[in-house]
């Protein structure tokens, strides 16, 4: 693994920390922290605090988590750093920062990345950043996890933390690509999805490509609303996106990468998503130019699925969700141009490895009940209860007649009914704000 990664993911690893109202379950992956139980009921609240972790000097840091959060549970991940800085009198000083939060996470809550500020450090949505000038750095951290349940019959579980960090050293320049390597990945355009969110779902579209390669059969909007950060009011929180992948059982994390680590993943059969900034206008001097790019963007996520050499020039093979159709998503970018665009995107990469635990998806079977034959109005039933179709609850409703090749988008009639002219051999997906997707097979 890259030298800028630190893992906590085994029974022995978790034992090094302090567990308050928590236990380590050896039957989940290689070990996972869960709430302790009393008389077969889980305690409502627990805290894990890691040992002090020594790292190389860093200015920025990411903490990813792999977890399961059943309905009624959530977790919050925090970090603090031991920071070296010069005080107002130019004296060298060392001090722990305050505990800062990467946010409250759960698959069935309104996730939020909001964090209080500190005079030494801050969290900017998904990055822990040391304040001050380039000489203000840290080399020690601790992480803390708060686990909570409102239903004492279930507990959240955390099976892995991954820390990635970077300093002020220059990024790694081009390295030799030994041979062509291209991984099959489905191609999805963000621009043919729900028109209300098409311009801002590059990240969940990329995550969906990576997961559907593994036959998860996810819908882009389903992924998007499962990653949505209600404080950031956006779908692009890096840590929330990989946390969603982990909620399906996958080992996943965000890494400050370089070409060496990108090559490591591709040649191990793992495509990755990366953060870039680029322009397709050669006269635009604000962003790095990429020939054949579909747009100009101040921040974007795409999938890297391979390397290729043609006529002596190295290329990366990508699935860029900014392509206007599924057929135009796969593209080849010159490696040198891609490097510059990726560097401007902080060299972020989403890494998704194999599934470590089996976790059921968040889909619930539903059925249709005809309410008005003349106007073809239907209610949606879930276990004999009518589903709320108001905009307060429903995020997106999709219908497909061709097994998901194409979708139409539905707006409920009067917040209560679906108007269906033709329900022959269709499947309807209702994505709720409760973290579940309700599926009607017509």
How does the language model describe each region?
Residues 4-23, 32, 53-56, 87, ...:
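Noncatalytic regulatory segments and standalone regulatory/sensor domains
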Residues 41, 217-356, 410:
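Conserved active-site-adjacent core of cysteine acyl-enzyme catalytic domains
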Residues 2-165:
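Non-cytosolic beta-sandwich-type ligand-binding/adhesion modules
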Residues 63-65, 378-391:
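Aromatic/hydrophobic beta-strand junction motif of beta-rich domains
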Residues 409, 435-442:
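Edge beta-strands of extracellular beta-sandwich domains
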Residues 141-147, 424-434:
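Short, aromatic- and glycine-rich surface loops/edge beta-strands on solvent-exposed regions
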Residues 140, 146-235, 310:
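Active-site-adjacent structural segments surrounding the nucleophilic cysteine of cysteine proteases
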Residues 133-137, 417-425:
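Surface-exposed, short loops/turns at beta-strand junctions within beta-sandwich domains
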